[in-house]
Amino acid sequence: MKASLEGFTLIELMIVILIIGIMSAVAVPRFEKRIELEELRFEKKFTYQIWEELELYAKQQKELTGMESWPTNPLSVLGRMRNVIVTYSLGIPDKDNEWRFDGTKLYHRRMNNEVWYFEYNSDNFYLSELPTKL
């Protein structure tokens, strides 16, 4: 009797690996783009929350002093935040998902270690809506 050999041939394994490689080549860039879009969505939502708090601050200042004003540091209007690192020291963030302010720019370090920033000017009541890559 002849022994039965079961299993995959080398050609079959190579074809499966090739198919997985092609699928990965298509899926990975899409996945990275999706992550980038989610980071942008989060940043816009976060800065919108800051904007709302700045407007509330300006309203309170008008009631107290008779003049609207925004704080020098936009991060100072935030309360407690989950999953966000807010650092009040100056400079560029060095941790993932950290936010810092340097006097004119509100910096955010994304999960892929890219640093993006939003322009801020308390004198002109200005906070940019879209980030710029550093």
Predicted segments with their positions:
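Alpha-helix boundary/interfacial micro-motifs
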Residues: 29, 38-41, 46-47, 70, ...
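Extracellular/periplasmic head regions of type IV pilus-like filament subunits
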Residues: 59-122, 130-134
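N-terminal single-pass transmembrane signal-anchor helix
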Residues: 2-31
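Membrane-proximal N-terminal amphipathic helix
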Residues: 36-63
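Helix-centric, low-specificity signal for extended rod-like, repetitive segments
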Residues: 11, 27, 37-38, 73
